[in-house]
């Protein structure tokens, strides 16, 4: 057997209210960059399904920028570490790692010749540094600020200039190399959030939380204009700006939920207004080629349409909290993913477009979800089970409230029956209401219902599998199976009804004969940490497993010694795996991404 990565369904940018989101543009015009968790996400601007993820930061990444040559990317993280790495090779070999600041890096700017960088953020000793790209040697001092620097930029034409904007309400001007402080621009009255030179180097725009934008001369740093409206250029703070490639226009985005295009003299040309609550505040922007991008607090990436300002040309959604569960609808071919923040998305696997389920849903982490006919059954840490119609996907008014926190959910296909295990009971729901509750002396961890709906397997903290018969809504315990050395973490019945597989905290994976309830296959202990999820192929022969060790394995029941390992499928751990079709596996994990893999026998 062999495997190949098919598609990456990327996470959305990590966001924090009141902090700008920095997007990095590709000098060749093909890709754009952002960060989520410890990862840097590289996405094709025209086809977002073409993506790559760089995982090598030890701390959450905060910003990434392409070198103008296009051959390297510089990325920074919360610890003040800067990594410069190769973009031309799939492995992204590291050029250099430098501890530049003692606190978070907020922004990075390259010189036009790709030889120098300015790195800014927070720290105890300094708020910024100007360095050579290949050695980290200093090429000047970024001084003159009394508080953390939020943004910086490098003039793309000679003579080189550097500008920084900080929380001390001022933008500082530097000339070099070596770069030295020249003067400060002090007309902002609140934090600066973004400073950007126009591509031709003639002008600079500075924006801040005072709702103002000032235009400075690109050679001297002297004020030459301002965005029309003064303190009312936007109704709330401006978080980001980005110039058009021809330097004649500039895009700004604001917490007032609008994006605006201005000419190079500050005259307003176009307004893009968004509706919604706080989550619709716009925090990031990028103008690359003919594509204008804006990012909101929710992490959604909008492609703005200048010809139709009322409707974005495209909206990219994803998770920016770890993905906890997956479910697949074989009828519609839609994939459903639930995350730690209670969000459930419906994915079109062909286009890569995700749509959130409408309405008010779970308020906390989605523990598990499964498709039953034309509805999605999900359980959450919020102590509810929800039955969500899928045509169209719309949350019902309320879910079924449970007495304690649900651990797992399973459904009887073809019947209106769902089984949920809580911390101390096994609950059968019918018609979306609790029909019976069976108190147990053990602590359940996982549940599955057999293909014919007659049997329920409950895995437990006592390292056992408790087998129940299911008649109507009544459960009767039939057997207790032992053999596992750790508590149960995953169970699944084979589609042909002849077997079931189980996995535990201690990495063991067993295949059981359903009729005799004897172990048929054992010895699958190749994972290095707890197995979190397992699923059967429709052929009832191959099993896929995911683990906290970050790996995905595919096993063969007919040839137990035969397996393939997808190493580091999701950095940090795999939370969910399933089969999309007989040759495609989907996986999700702590990196907030979903990936599909082609499996060849």
UniProtKB/Swiss-Prot annotation:
Keyword Repeat: yes
InterPro entries: WD40/YVTN_repeat-like_dom_sf (IPR015943), WD40_repeat_dom_sf (IPR036322), WD40_rpt (IPR001680)
Gene Ontology terms: cellular component: cortical actin cytoskeleton
Gene3D superfamilies linked: YVTN repeat-like/Quinoprotein amine dehydrogenase
Xref: SMART domains: WD40 (SM00320)
Keyword terms of this UniProt record: Repeat, WD repeat
Pfam family name, one: WD40
GO biological-process terms attached to the record: actin filament depolymerization
WD repeats: 56-95, 100-143, 145-184, 187-226, 233-272, 318-357, 435-478, 483-522, 526-565, 569-600
Molecular function via GO: actin filament binding
Family matches, as PANTHER family: WD REPEAT-CONTAINING PROTEIN 1, WD-REPEATCONTAINING PROTEIN WDR1
Stated role: Associated with the process of cyst formation.
Similarity section: Belongs to the WD repeat AIP1 family.
Record-given protein name: 66 kDa stress protein
Species in which this protein is naturally found: Physarum polycephalum (Slime mold)
Taxonomic path: Eukaryota, Amoebozoa, Evosea, Eumycetozoa, Myxogastria
